[in-house]
């Protein structure tokens, strides 16, 4: 059930379930009462307020889980340094997003499901979970077939150890430092098509748990491989 809030005369709050409304009223509520940012800057301002003063953010924007992000194309650095953020945003519409680099950079407490996200338009996931130390959620269902950048994607994501073997990484060209000090990761990724990758330098540096066969990988395009398995 989707719980939404309505402010009455700027003072009183009432809460209703969206599913209980007639269809026509649902559309009106979605159009006028659910926060729908038009730009990254508008969304970033709302996120900052949410992380700094949740009560004020609730009054101004409603709950972050209900925001309509369907117009946003760039979510880079969105939760950068939001060290205490840990709210569910799995219902966000990210289908228009192309850039998610550094999205959860040092969001050290974040560990919420993201498996409902449609990331099929995203091309850049570089450093997406950089130092997102608590994150360990299933994302194997993601369509990453458009992604070209995964450099440092899980850098320092020390808790992450979920399967990602279903990912289509055939468009990725840069995996440098992808699992750098991702110290818990030990999932089979030997089936990946890495034939387009040119950079695998320090890819598993400090990934002390990783012990999976990758001998079937086609490394014919790789030009940078230094320190791939350095401790």
Where are these regions (language model features)?
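CRL adaptor-proximal regions
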Residues: 1-20, 31
């Amino acid at each position: 059930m989707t719980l939404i809030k309505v402010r009455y005369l700027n003072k009183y709050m009432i809460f209703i379930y969206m599913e209980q409304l007639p269809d026509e009223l649902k559309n009106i509520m979605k159009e006028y009462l659910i926060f729908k940012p038009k730009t990254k800057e508008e969304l970033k301002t709302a996120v900052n307020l949410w992380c700094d003063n949740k009560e004020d953010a609730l009054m101004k924007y409603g709950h972050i889980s209900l925001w309509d992000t369907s117009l946003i194309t760039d979510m880079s650095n969105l939760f950068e340094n939001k060290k205490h953020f840990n709210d569910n945003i799995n219902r966000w519409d990210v289908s228009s997003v192309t850039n998610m680099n550094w999205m959860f950079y040092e969001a050290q407490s974040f560990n919420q499901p993201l498996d409902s996200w449609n990331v099929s338009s995203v091309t850049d996931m570089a450093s997406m979970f950089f130092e997102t130390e608590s994150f360990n959620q299933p994302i194997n269902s993601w369509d990453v077939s458009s992604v070209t950048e995964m450099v440092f994607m899980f850098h320092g994501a020390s808790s992450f150890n979920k399967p990602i073997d279903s990912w289509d990484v055939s468009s990725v060209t840069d995996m440098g430092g992808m699992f750098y000090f991702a110290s818990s990761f030990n999932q089979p990724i030997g089936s990946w098509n890495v034939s387009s990758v040119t950079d695998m330098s320090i890819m598993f540096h400090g990934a002390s748990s990783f012990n999976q066969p990758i001998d079937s990988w086609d490394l014919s395009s790789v030009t940078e491989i230094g320190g791939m398995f350095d401790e």
